[in-house]
């Protein structure tokens, strides 16, 4: 069962995420170690928005609170009574989807993944607890393993040789592991690394093992489902966890063994065997950037309204390119690539940090294949 401190961490991380949505120095919010002070410093609009988010997470009407402590007490009581948390997908237009998970589902998932982490002595969390990935592996998993959790800011340049201990499970995300690999730091002994939220390049997984990582686990799942499958090595398909039943006919469907509702796999995938799958991913509609759901069509709509832009396309980078968005632009007459600066300035005023494309490519027409269909670049 969750404790009041667990609820406090969930709400504190949700608060930080709300503040980070509109700040260029987003990481500084997550380094802040006094969430009560962050709460007290909220503007009226920010507090109203956060109170709405908190209410939706615990399936309650939005309610005003004078302090973070009062909010924690109220929603801890709500959780004890209803046994439910809605995990919210982080939409880019202000709307989000509620993904309800009951305490039965939480317990089933935590116990269902437990066997993967035998020998773990401590969990080091680099991810927020209000998203399902962070919740499952840094809130619920420590309870079933009987180990402590330490939450640290995800700074690749930190002195990890001193911060980590043998037997640690480091719960991270693709961008952090990419930075680690680029820095070329060797891992301390007996470190287990975990990753989810978006696909990891096989070359990156191999590189982490070259840096003396003891064990790597990549989780495939979604906010709607929770953890579905895992893999440990490059070029492997994902093995489905035992608490899922799979129907591979036509569209791949799955359901929890404790439940009765079948649902379609959240991504396109192909089956290697009855319980092994290879996700093919979503590249155009909803993607994740640093753990936040981002919608490329929304970014395209904003970008297309700039007078310099005749046509544009926005996609998630391929794993070997990075973990941000990229944009392809066809310019109107009278504009050239030297106008990229004004386009960037315009976008920074309209988009969140996670929505901002990291790279821009220019050309006379949008990329298409021989059949005239849109293609990557």
Question: Which stretches of residues belong to each language-model region?
Answer:
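Conserved adenylation A10 loop of the ANL superfamily
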Residues: 86-98, 223-224
């Amino acid at each position: 069962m969750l404790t009041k401190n667990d609820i406090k961490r969930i709400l504190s991380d949700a608060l930080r995420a709300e503040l980070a949505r509109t700040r260029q120095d987003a990481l500084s919010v997550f380094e802040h170690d006094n969430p009560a002070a962050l709460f007290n410093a909220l503007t009226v609009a920010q507090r109203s928005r956060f109170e709405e988010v908190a209410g939706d997470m615990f399936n309650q009407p939005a309610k005003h609170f004078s302090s973070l402590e009062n909010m924690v007490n109220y929603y801890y009581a709500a959780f004890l009574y209803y046994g439910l948390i809605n995990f919210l997908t982080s939409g880019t237009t202000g709307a989000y989807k509620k993904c309800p998970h009951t305490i039965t589902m939480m317990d089933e998932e935590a116990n269902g993944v437990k066997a993967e982490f035998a020998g773990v002595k401590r969990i080091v969390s680099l991810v927020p607890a209000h998203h399902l990935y962070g919740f499952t592996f840094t809130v619920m998993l420590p309870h079933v393993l009987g180990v402590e959790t330490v939450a640290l800011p995800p700074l690749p340049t930190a002195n990890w040789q001193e911060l980590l201990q043998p037997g640690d499970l480091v719960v991270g995300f693709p961008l952090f592991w990419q930075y680690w690999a680029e820095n070329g730091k060797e891992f301390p002994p007996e470190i287990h690394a975990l990753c989810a939220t978006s696909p990891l390049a096989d070359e990156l997984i191999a590189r982490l093992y070259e840096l003396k990582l003891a064990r790597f686990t990549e989780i495939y799942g979604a906010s709607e489902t929770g953890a579905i499958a895992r893999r440990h090595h490059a070029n492997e398909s994902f093995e489905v966890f035992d608490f899922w039943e799979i129907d591979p006919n036509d569209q791949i469907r799955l359901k929890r063994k404790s439940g009765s509702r079948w649902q379609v796999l959240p991504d396109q995938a192909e089956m290697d065997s009855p319980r092994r799958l290879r996700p093919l991913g979503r590249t155009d509609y909803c993607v994740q950037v640093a753990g936040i759901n981002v919608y490329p069509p929304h970014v395209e709509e904003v970008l297309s309204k700039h007078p310099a832009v005749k046509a544009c396309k926005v996609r998630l980078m391929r794993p070997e390119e990075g973990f941000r968005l990229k944009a392809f632009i066809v310019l109107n007459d009278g504009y050239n690539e030297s106008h990229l600066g004004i386009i960037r300035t315009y976008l920074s005023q309209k988009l969140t940090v996670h929505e901002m494309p990291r790279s821009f490519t220019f050309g006379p027409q949008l990329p298409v294949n021989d059949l005239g269909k849109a293609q990557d670049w």
